[in-house]
Amino acid sequence: MACTTILVGKDASYDGSTIIARNEDSANGEFCPKRFIVVKPEDQPRKYKSVLSHVEIDLPDNPLQYTAVPNADLKEGIWGEAGVNEANVAMSATETLTTNERVLGADPFVELTPAKGKEGEEGFEPEVAGGIGEEDFLTLVLPYVTTAREGVKRLGALLEEFGTYEMNGVAFSDVDEIWWLETVGGHHWIAKRVPDEAYVTMPNQLGIDEFDLEDAFGEQEDHMCSADLAEFIERNHLDLSVESTTPFNPRDAFGSHSDSDHVYNTPRAWYMQRFLNPYDEQWDGQDADHKPVSDDIPWARQPERKITIEDVKYVLSSHYQGTPYDPYGKLGDQRTRHMFRPIGINRQSQLAVMQIRPYRPQVSRAIQWIAYGSNPFNTLVPFFPNVNSTPKYLEDTTTRVTSENFYWENRIIAALCDSSFADTANAVERYQEKTGAMGHRMVASTDEQIERLVGDVTDEFDAEDEIGDVQPMEPDEIIEAVRNGEAREILAAANENMAAQLKEETDKLLDSVLYTASMNMKNGFHMSDF
């Protein structure tokens, strides 16, 4: 999918949480209705078959419960995209990446080969299944891992065994770590731990720009990779470093620097880092350190201040505000305003922001923030994932257009606001601020209820552990704590209350922008009947 990702290390976030976030965007000319659901262990398949590639995979018999944001129409498969499991591990999959001819020549994609001829007749060739891809990743991995590192290792093993038919970037997080995995060709992969004090920006381009192979084949403190990656690089002359002392650069070896990158990918990384580090360097003009078309914009950077949930929403909604490239702006001209692909684009399906909070009990520390539709016109609101079901307003998305579910209501609002951007901007901003504040209040009040139920967990320990976790536990203990039935009822009630308030405010916004857009219709006239 044509997506945009931001990852925020725990020391770079405003509250010590790990935060992973990604826009899921459809291909140009397509729109994809989404649902927010809970997948229970009994509903998880034991034998999985991909709709697109036809690959069949036997799955373990002990899945964890997890959330997902699948397609409402399953004709092309599940596409679970983002979720949190009962071990408080989050996963976002996938960011479609670019590659180059050298990589694909050395390790081609594993694509579905249809059958030729008719079975039983001379010359018949049976179908050959393809590999795994974005359709499959969340379903195949998230229910079976208890740490972010385990997520990397499980997906890596699946890639080596079954291969893939596309380039993908995948994020995993737990309370302590964030890992970013990038596929390389059909069967290879690399993964790097996001520095705690940094954030990562990822447009649709292979991003990791420095990789320690010695660590990946040794202690694996911050790097992991496929078993034969070093041999693969050497055999195919993929290391483009000029000097032997230069760190290996995967972006040069496995990625791309094409003309299309400079209108579709690099400008997005430029704008996100320009917003989060405005004073670190010169971003504009001929003497800029990095420009929208620069190929060397860093994969990871330390922010100038701590990053909030609202910052994440802003950068993932952005359309180059304050620059000549803003399609809604007054700077520049018609050429510049449509020069680069915006981050907040018309064909956004959903945005999922997964936050794992070390300062709350295991049962309530995970939050999955959700937005549907085009980000400049929607709102991001929190839901607790460790529940038995999700609110119908977000779950019961239909393939039929209706104002009765969150996805379609957002789609309608965005279409109305686009042509009346200036006239509806204030109403949208007020809606975003009000619903965002409602979300933070809901989280705070629910935290208080959970604290009364389970007690102040900080009293159970003499001191916080080395990562600031107030309730450090082994994975089995986390799962047991998260399955507290009474706590789940509290979290589910909070989610339902959030959804009810959200619908009320979204209905009000729809009413407001519909009136404004109707008044701006070209067939209006300033006189009425006498």
Model-flagged regions — what are they?
Residues 15, 26-29, 36-45, 58, ...:
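C-terminal/peripheral segments of proteins
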Residues 144-150:
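Short, charged, surface-exposed loops that flank catalytic or proteolytic processing sites
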Residues 325-463:
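Substrate-recognition/cap regions that form aromatic- and gly/pro-loop-enriched pockets
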Residues 151-160, 312-316:
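Short, well-structured alpha-helical segments that form the helix of a local strand-helix-strand
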Residues 231-364:
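Glycine-rich, aromatic-lined ligand/substrate-binding cores of catalytic
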Residues 2-134, 154-289:
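A contiguous strand-loop segment
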Residues 138-144:
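Short, well-ordered beta-strand elements within core beta-sheets of diverse protein domains
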Residues 436-530:
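Histidine-centered catalytic/metal-binding microenvironments
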